[in-house]
């Protein structure tokens, strides 16, 4: 039987309080205590901790017919953010999202891809400028997701097939070393499909098809992106049937 220390229990309770507020904005201390079956003093302690870490904030007072109106709490949605980069042959799209998946800012950078030190230097400076303009502090960035046109290893660490960018075998370490935050490759169509799921959480089963200069797609099953053991299940791609076309 797994044993939990007092510290483990406190961390779990703190996490539970935060996630309850995340899912139930404008909730009261009593709401949290009732929902999580913990004491009011315990909730108060965790609220103080989360406020001191600037992860939550008071957002007014709740209406009450008797007595003092209770404080309402919500998370600070941009206390932590994620950066998304779409790497294309001749441009790079960059955006930032908050903890609810809502876009904060976006920009298109005229940075053409090439597997060189010069490219990574340009990209790093462009991302740093984007973060500075939009007041994104380094410590608030949870990580960077890189949407690419190609097949990705199951753990997102390698571009296993990248004919469009001519970068098959490229490692995510090239980006992680440049940005010093966790980075991960994601198939571009899966990025778009995941965005649809964030915006429409009631979707259970669906097929996503991206029609542009290149064909792409993904499949949603039971409300989850279908990836399979190799990370390629549900991926829509095209293939050459006749090299150089028919005569």
Placement of each model-derived feature along the sequence:
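Conserved phosphate-binding catalytic cores of ATP/NTP-utilizing and phosphoryl-transfer enzymes
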Residues: 58-80, 185-208
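Glycine-rich phosphate-binding loop and adjoining helix at the ATP-binding site
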Residues: 107-205, 242-245
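Glycine-rich phosphate-binding loop of actin/hexokinase-like ATP-binding domains
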Residues: 201-247
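Gly/Thr-rich phosphate-binding beta-strand-loop-beta motif of the actin/hexokinase/Hsp70
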Residues: 69-106, 208-225
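N-terminal helix-turn-helix
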Residues: 26-58, 68
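Extreme N-terminal segment that seeds HTH/winged-HTH DNA-binding domains in transcriptional regulators
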Residues: 1-29, 33-34
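Short clusters of small/polar residues that mark proteolytic maturation junctions
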Residues: 32, 61, 108, 163-164, ...
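Short glycine-rich, Thr/Ser-proximal phosphate-binding strand/loop in the N-terminal lobe
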Residues: 4, 83-117, 159, 232-236, ...
